[in-house]
Protein backbone atom coordinates (compact mmCIF):
# COMPACT_ATOMS: atom_id res chain seq x y z
CA UNK A 1 0.00 0.00 0.00
CA UNK A 2 2.81 2.41 0.95
CA UNK A 3 4.59 1.65 -2.29
CA UNK A 4 1.43 2.47 -4.25
CA UNK A 5 1.01 5.74 -2.32
CA UNK A 6 4.64 6.65 -2.91
CA UNK A 7 4.26 5.88 -6.61
CA UNK A 8 1.08 7.99 -6.73
CA UNK A 9 2.80 10.98 -5.09
CA UNK A 10 5.75 10.67 -7.46
CA UNK A 11 3.36 10.65 -10.41
CA UNK A 12 1.47 13.71 -9.13
CA UNK A 13 4.72 15.64 -8.64
CA UNK A 14 5.80 14.70 -12.15
CA UNK A 15 2.49 15.91 -13.65
CA UNK A 16 2.69 19.19 -11.67
CA UNK A 17 6.22 19.79 -12.94
CA UNK A 18 5.14 19.12 -16.52
CA UNK A 19 2.10 21.43 -16.10
CA UNK A 20 4.30 24.25 -14.78
CA UNK A 21 6.90 23.92 -17.55
CA UNK A 22 4.27 23.71 -20.32
CA UNK A 23 2.42 26.75 -18.89
CA UNK A 24 5.69 28.67 -18.74
CA UNK A 25 6.38 27.76 -22.37
CA UNK A 26 2.92 28.93 -23.45
CA UNK A 27 3.17 32.33 -21.71
CA UNK A 28 6.72 32.97 -22.89
CA UNK A 29 6.02 31.90 -26.47
CA UNK A 30 2.84 33.98 -26.87
CA UNK A 31 4.54 37.07 -25.42
CA UNK A 32 7.51 36.58 -27.76
CA UNK A 33 5.28 36.37 -30.85
CA UNK A 34 3.44 39.60 -30.03
CA UNK A 35 6.67 41.47 -29.21
CA UNK A 36 8.33 40.30 -32.44
CA UNK A 37 5.28 41.18 -34.53
CA UNK A 38 5.28 44.67 -33.03
CA UNK A 39 8.94 45.13 -33.97
CA UNK A 40 8.50 43.80 -37.50
CA UNK A 41 5.21 45.32 -38.63
CA UNK A 42 3.89 48.01 -36.29
CA UNK A 43 3.61 51.61 -37.47
CA UNK A 44 5.88 52.86 -34.67
CA UNK A 45 8.78 50.43 -35.21
CA UNK A 46 8.45 48.59 -38.55
CA UNK A 47 12.07 47.43 -38.63
CA UNK A 48 11.75 45.28 -41.76
CA UNK A 49 14.83 43.19 -40.92
CA UNK A 50 13.61 39.90 -39.42
CA UNK A 51 16.97 38.09 -39.64
CA UNK A 52 18.78 41.01 -37.98
CA UNK A 53 16.24 40.85 -35.17
CA UNK A 54 16.81 37.09 -34.89
CA UNK A 55 20.57 37.70 -34.75
CA UNK A 56 20.19 40.30 -32.00
CA UNK A 57 18.05 37.89 -29.98
CA UNK A 58 20.89 35.36 -30.17
CA UNK A 59 23.41 38.03 -29.14
CA UNK A 60 21.36 38.93 -26.04
CA UNK A 61 21.02 35.26 -25.11
CA UNK A 62 24.76 34.70 -25.56
CA UNK A 63 25.63 37.71 -23.38
CA UNK A 64 23.27 36.50 -20.63
CA UNK A 65 24.83 33.04 -20.63
CA UNK A 66 28.38 34.47 -20.73
CA UNK A 67 27.71 36.75 -17.75
CA UNK A 68 26.06 33.89 -15.84
CA UNK A 69 29.09 31.70 -16.56
CA UNK A 70 31.53 34.33 -15.28
CA UNK A 71 29.45 35.05 -12.16
CA UNK A 72 29.29 31.34 -11.43
CA UNK A 73 33.08 31.11 -11.47
CA UNK A 74 33.55 34.19 -9.31
CA UNK A 75 30.67 33.60 -6.88
CA UNK A 76 30.00 29.83 -6.96
CA UNK A 77 28.02 29.94 -3.72
CA UNK A 78 25.55 32.46 -5.19
CA UNK A 79 25.38 31.67 -8.93
CA UNK A 80 25.36 28.27 -10.59
CA UNK A 81 26.21 27.71 -14.24
CA UNK A 82 27.56 24.48 -15.75
CA UNK A 83 31.21 24.42 -16.80
CA UNK A 84 31.94 24.33 -20.50
CA UNK A 85 34.04 25.80 -23.28
CA UNK A 86 32.09 26.92 -26.38
CA UNK A 87 35.38 27.40 -28.28
CA UNK A 88 36.26 23.72 -28.00
CA UNK A 89 36.44 22.26 -31.52
CA UNK A 90 34.88 18.93 -30.53
CA UNK A 91 31.99 20.70 -28.80
CA UNK A 92 31.48 22.97 -31.81
CA UNK A 93 31.37 19.98 -34.16
CA UNK A 94 28.78 18.16 -32.02
CA UNK A 95 26.47 21.13 -31.37
CA UNK A 96 26.71 22.76 -34.84
CA UNK A 97 23.91 20.62 -36.42
CA UNK A 98 21.53 21.77 -33.67
CA UNK A 99 22.62 25.40 -34.14
CA UNK A 100 21.96 25.18 -37.88
CA UNK A 101 18.44 23.92 -37.18
CA UNK A 102 17.95 26.60 -34.52
CA UNK A 103 19.06 29.32 -36.93
CA UNK A 104 16.75 27.99 -39.62
CA UNK A 105 13.86 27.67 -37.16
CA UNK A 106 13.89 31.17 -35.65
CA UNK A 107 14.95 32.80 -38.93
CA UNK A 108 12.07 31.25 -40.89
CA UNK A 109 9.79 31.92 -37.94
CA UNK A 110 10.47 35.67 -37.92
CA UNK A 111 10.39 35.84 -41.72
CA UNK A 112 6.95 34.24 -41.65
CA UNK A 113 5.77 36.59 -38.91
CA UNK A 114 6.88 39.62 -40.94
CA UNK A 115 4.52 38.63 -43.78
CA UNK A 116 1.46 37.13 -42.06
CA UNK A 117 -0.88 38.16 -39.27
CA UNK A 118 -0.54 36.70 -35.78
CA UNK A 119 -3.96 35.10 -36.21
CA UNK A 120 -2.84 33.14 -39.29
CA UNK A 121 0.71 32.61 -38.04
CA UNK A 122 -0.13 29.32 -36.31
CA UNK A 123 -1.37 27.59 -39.50
CA UNK A 124 2.12 26.79 -40.77
CA UNK A 125 3.15 25.65 -37.29
CA UNK A 126 0.25 23.19 -37.22
CA UNK A 127 2.22 20.86 -39.50
CA UNK A 128 4.94 20.37 -36.89
CA UNK A 129 3.26 17.22 -35.58
CA UNK A 130 3.04 15.78 -39.09
CA UNK A 131 6.70 16.55 -39.76
CA UNK A 132 7.60 15.03 -36.39
CA UNK A 133 5.92 11.74 -37.31
CA UNK A 134 7.64 11.64 -40.71
CA UNK A 135 11.07 12.47 -39.29
CA UNK A 136 10.65 10.01 -36.42
CA UNK A 137 10.24 7.27 -39.02
CA UNK A 138 12.94 8.53 -41.39
CA UNK A 139 15.59 9.29 -38.74
CA UNK A 140 14.71 7.05 -35.78
CA UNK A 141 12.98 4.28 -37.76
CA UNK A 142 10.04 4.32 -35.33
CA UNK A 143 6.71 3.38 -36.88
CA UNK A 144 3.47 5.22 -36.12
CA UNK A 145 0.11 3.56 -35.60
CA UNK A 146 -2.70 3.85 -38.15
CA UNK A 147 -4.81 5.91 -35.72
CA UNK A 148 -2.00 8.45 -35.38
CA UNK A 149 -1.66 8.64 -39.15
CA UNK A 150 -5.40 9.38 -39.43
CA UNK A 151 -4.96 12.24 -36.96
CA UNK A 152 -2.06 13.59 -39.03
CA UNK A 153 -4.25 13.41 -42.12
CA UNK A 154 -6.89 15.50 -40.35
CA UNK A 155 -4.23 18.06 -39.38
CA UNK A 156 -3.19 18.38 -43.03
CA UNK A 157 -6.85 18.88 -44.03
CA UNK A 158 -7.21 21.61 -41.39
CA UNK A 159 -4.03 23.25 -42.63
CA UNK A 160 -5.17 23.38 -46.25
CA UNK A 161 -8.61 24.64 -45.24
CA UNK A 162 -6.98 27.43 -43.25
CA UNK A 163 -4.71 28.39 -46.16
CA UNK A 164 -7.68 28.33 -48.54
CA UNK A 165 -9.73 30.65 -46.34
CA UNK A 166 -6.82 32.98 -45.60
CA UNK A 167 -6.09 33.28 -49.34
CA UNK A 168 -9.49 34.98 -49.71
CA UNK A 169 -8.34 37.89 -47.52
CA UNK A 170 -6.23 40.89 -48.51
CA UNK A 171 -3.50 40.12 -45.97
CA UNK A 172 -2.67 36.63 -47.26
CA UNK A 173 0.98 35.94 -48.14
CA UNK A 174 2.25 32.79 -49.85
CA UNK A 175 5.78 33.74 -48.90
CA UNK A 176 4.84 33.99 -45.24
CA UNK A 177 3.01 30.65 -45.45
CA UNK A 178 6.03 28.89 -46.98
CA UNK A 179 8.34 30.30 -44.31
CA UNK A 180 5.86 29.10 -41.69
CA UNK A 181 5.94 25.55 -43.07
CA UNK A 182 9.74 25.68 -43.23
CA UNK A 183 9.84 26.81 -39.61
CA UNK A 184 7.59 23.87 -38.65
CA UNK A 185 9.93 21.43 -40.38
CA UNK A 186 12.95 22.96 -38.64
CA UNK A 187 11.17 22.81 -35.27
CA UNK A 188 10.40 19.11 -35.69
CA UNK A 189 14.03 18.40 -36.59
CA UNK A 190 15.26 20.67 -33.79
CA UNK A 191 13.16 18.82 -31.20
CA UNK A 192 14.63 15.47 -32.20
CA UNK A 193 18.20 16.81 -32.36
CA UNK A 194 17.87 18.53 -28.95
CA UNK A 195 17.50 15.20 -27.13
CA UNK A 196 20.70 14.01 -28.79
CA UNK A 197 22.60 17.25 -28.15
CA UNK A 198 21.65 17.32 -24.46
CA UNK A 199 23.63 14.11 -24.11
CA UNK A 200 26.78 15.95 -25.25
CA UNK A 201 26.45 18.51 -22.41
CA UNK A 202 25.41 16.15 -19.59
CA UNK A 203 21.73 17.18 -19.92
CA UNK A 204 22.59 20.81 -19.04
CA UNK A 205 19.95 23.02 -20.68
CA UNK A 206 21.77 26.26 -19.79
CA UNK A 207 25.01 25.09 -21.36
CA UNK A 208 23.25 23.90 -24.51
CA UNK A 209 21.46 27.26 -24.78
CA UNK A 210 24.82 29.07 -24.42
CA UNK A 211 26.51 27.06 -27.17
CA UNK A 212 23.49 27.15 -29.43
CA UNK A 213 23.01 30.93 -29.34
CA UNK A 214 26.72 31.70 -29.69
CA UNK A 215 27.07 29.53 -32.79
CA UNK A 216 23.83 30.93 -34.24
CA UNK A 217 25.14 34.52 -34.00
CA UNK A 218 27.84 33.48 -36.45
CA UNK A 219 25.45 31.59 -38.73
CA UNK A 220 23.05 34.54 -39.02
CA UNK A 221 25.65 37.05 -40.30
CA UNK A 222 25.88 35.75 -43.89
CA UNK A 223 22.11 35.22 -43.97
CA UNK A 224 21.50 38.88 -43.07
CA UNK A 225 23.69 39.94 -46.00
CA UNK A 226 22.10 37.45 -48.41
CA UNK A 227 18.60 38.63 -47.43
CA UNK A 228 19.57 42.23 -48.25
CA UNK A 229 18.92 43.60 -44.76
CA UNK A 230 22.11 45.66 -44.40
CA UNK A 231 20.65 48.62 -46.30
CA UNK A 232 17.41 48.46 -44.28
CA UNK A 233 19.41 48.54 -41.04
CA UNK A 234 21.73 51.39 -42.08
CA UNK A 235 18.90 53.58 -43.40
CA UNK A 236 16.49 52.81 -40.53
CA UNK A 237 15.38 56.23 -39.17
CA UNK A 238 15.19 55.14 -35.51
CA UNK A 239 18.47 53.20 -35.45
CA UNK A 240 19.98 55.31 -32.65
CA UNK A 241 16.78 55.87 -30.66
CA UNK A 242 16.94 54.56 -27.09
CA UNK A 243 13.36 53.25 -27.19
CA UNK A 244 14.20 51.16 -30.27
CA UNK A 245 17.09 49.39 -28.56
CA UNK A 246 14.97 48.95 -25.44
CA UNK A 247 12.36 47.18 -27.58
CA UNK A 248 15.07 45.11 -29.26
CA UNK A 249 16.50 44.14 -25.88
CA UNK A 250 13.04 43.07 -24.70
CA UNK A 251 12.75 40.95 -27.83
CA UNK A 252 16.18 39.49 -27.07
CA UNK A 253 15.15 38.64 -23.51
CA UNK A 254 12.03 36.95 -24.86
CA UNK A 255 14.16 35.07 -27.38
CA UNK A 256 16.45 33.84 -24.60
CA UNK A 257 13.51 32.80 -22.46
CA UNK A 258 11.77 30.89 -25.26
CA UNK A 259 14.99 29.11 -26.20
CA UNK A 260 15.61 28.00 -22.64
CA UNK A 261 11.99 27.06 -21.90
CA UNK A 262 11.73 25.11 -25.18
CA UNK A 263 14.77 23.02 -24.29
CA UNK A 264 13.44 22.60 -20.74
CA UNK A 265 10.03 21.41 -21.99
CA UNK A 266 11.66 18.87 -24.30
CA UNK A 267 13.83 17.69 -21.40
CA UNK A 268 10.97 17.13 -18.91
CA UNK A 269 8.53 15.74 -21.52
CA UNK A 270 9.57 14.67 -25.02
CA UNK A 271 10.07 16.05 -28.51
CA UNK A 272 6.58 14.87 -29.47
CA UNK A 273 4.92 16.45 -26.43
CA UNK A 274 6.69 19.72 -27.12
CA UNK A 275 5.45 19.76 -30.73
CA UNK A 276 1.88 19.08 -29.65
CA UNK A 277 2.14 21.68 -26.90
CA UNK A 278 3.31 24.21 -29.47
CA UNK A 279 0.35 23.47 -31.74
CA UNK A 280 -2.20 23.76 -28.94
CA UNK A 281 -0.54 26.97 -27.73
CA UNK A 282 -0.78 28.39 -31.24
CA UNK A 283 -4.53 27.81 -31.29
CA UNK A 284 -4.94 29.75 -28.03
CA UNK A 285 -2.67 32.41 -29.47
CA UNK A 286 -4.94 32.70 -32.51
CA UNK A 287 -7.98 33.46 -30.36
CA UNK A 288 -6.02 36.10 -28.43
CA UNK A 289 -4.73 37.67 -31.66
CA UNK A 290 -8.17 37.96 -33.28
CA UNK A 291 -9.45 39.73 -30.18
CA UNK A 292 -6.41 41.99 -29.81
CA UNK A 293 -6.23 43.06 -33.47
CA UNK A 294 -10.04 42.98 -33.98
CA UNK A 295 -9.78 40.52 -36.88
CA UNK A 296 -13.04 39.20 -38.31
CA UNK A 297 -12.79 35.69 -39.79
CA UNK A 298 -15.20 33.39 -41.62
CA UNK A 299 -16.82 30.30 -40.12
CA UNK A 300 -14.73 28.02 -42.36
CA UNK A 301 -11.56 29.78 -41.21
CA UNK A 302 -12.46 29.02 -37.60
CA UNK A 303 -13.39 25.48 -38.63
CA UNK A 304 -9.82 24.94 -39.82
CA UNK A 305 -8.59 25.95 -36.37
CA UNK A 306 -10.98 23.53 -34.70
CA UNK A 307 -9.98 20.68 -37.04
CA UNK A 308 -6.29 21.17 -36.27
CA UNK A 309 -6.92 21.47 -32.53
CA UNK A 310 -9.18 18.39 -32.32
CA UNK A 311 -6.87 16.33 -34.54
CA UNK A 312 -3.85 17.33 -32.44
CA UNK A 313 -5.71 16.51 -29.23
CA UNK A 314 -6.77 13.15 -30.66
CA UNK A 315 -3.18 12.43 -31.69
CA UNK A 316 -2.01 13.24 -28.17
CA UNK A 317 -4.62 10.93 -26.65
CA UNK A 318 -3.75 8.06 -28.98
CA UNK A 319 -0.04 8.41 -28.21
CA UNK A 320 -0.81 8.59 -24.49
CA UNK A 321 -2.83 5.37 -24.59
CA UNK A 322 -0.08 3.65 -26.58
CA UNK A 323 2.56 4.72 -24.04
CA UNK A 324 0.41 3.55 -21.12
CA UNK A 325 -0.11 0.19 -22.82
CA UNK A 326 3.64 -0.20 -23.38
CA UNK A 327 4.33 0.76 -19.75
CA UNK A 328 1.85 -1.84 -18.48
CA UNK A 329 3.41 -4.49 -20.69
CA UNK A 330 6.89 -3.70 -19.33
CA UNK A 331 5.60 -3.75 -15.74
CA UNK A 332 3.92 -7.12 -16.29
CA UNK A 333 7.09 -8.53 -17.83
CA UNK A 334 9.16 -7.24 -14.88
CA UNK A 335 6.80 -8.78 -12.31
CA UNK A 336 6.92 -12.15 -14.07
CA UNK A 337 10.71 -12.00 -14.14
Curated annotation (Swiss-Prot):
Similarity comment: family membership: Belongs to the TPT transporter family. SLC35C subfamily.
Record's keyword terms, sorted: Golgi apparatus, Membrane, Sugar transport, Transmembrane, Transmembrane helix, Transport
GO molecular-function term, one example from the UniProt record: antiporter activity
PANTHER family: SOLUTE CARRIER FAMILY 35 (PTHR11132)
GO cellular component, one term: Golgi-associated vesicle
Name this polypeptide is given: GDP-fucose transporter, Golgi
Subcellular location, record wording: Golgi apparatus membrane
Protein's GO biological process: GDP-fucose import into Golgi lumen; GDP-fucose transmembrane transport
Chief location of this protein within or outside the cell: Golgi
Function per UniProt: Involved in GDP-fucose import from the cytoplasm into the Golgi lumen. Plays a major role in the fucosylation of N-glycans. Functions redundantly with Efr in the O-fucosylation of Notch, positively regulating Notch signaling.
Alphabetical list of Pfam families matching this protein: TPT
Lipid bilayer topology: Multi-pass membrane protein
Transmembrane annotation, as ranges: 13-35, 45-67, 95-117, 121-140, 145-163, 173-192, 205-227, 242-264
Keyword Transmembrane: yes
Amino acid sequence: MYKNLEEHNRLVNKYLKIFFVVSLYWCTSILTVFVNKHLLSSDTVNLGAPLFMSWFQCVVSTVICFVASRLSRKYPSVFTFPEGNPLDIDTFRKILPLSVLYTLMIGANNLSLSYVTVAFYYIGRSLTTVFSVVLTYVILRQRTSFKCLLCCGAIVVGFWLGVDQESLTEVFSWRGTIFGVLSSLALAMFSIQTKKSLGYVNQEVWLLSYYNNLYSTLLFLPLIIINGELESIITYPHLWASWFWAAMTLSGLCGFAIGFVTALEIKVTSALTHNISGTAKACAQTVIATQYYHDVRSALWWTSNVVVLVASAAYTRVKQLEMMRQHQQRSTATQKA
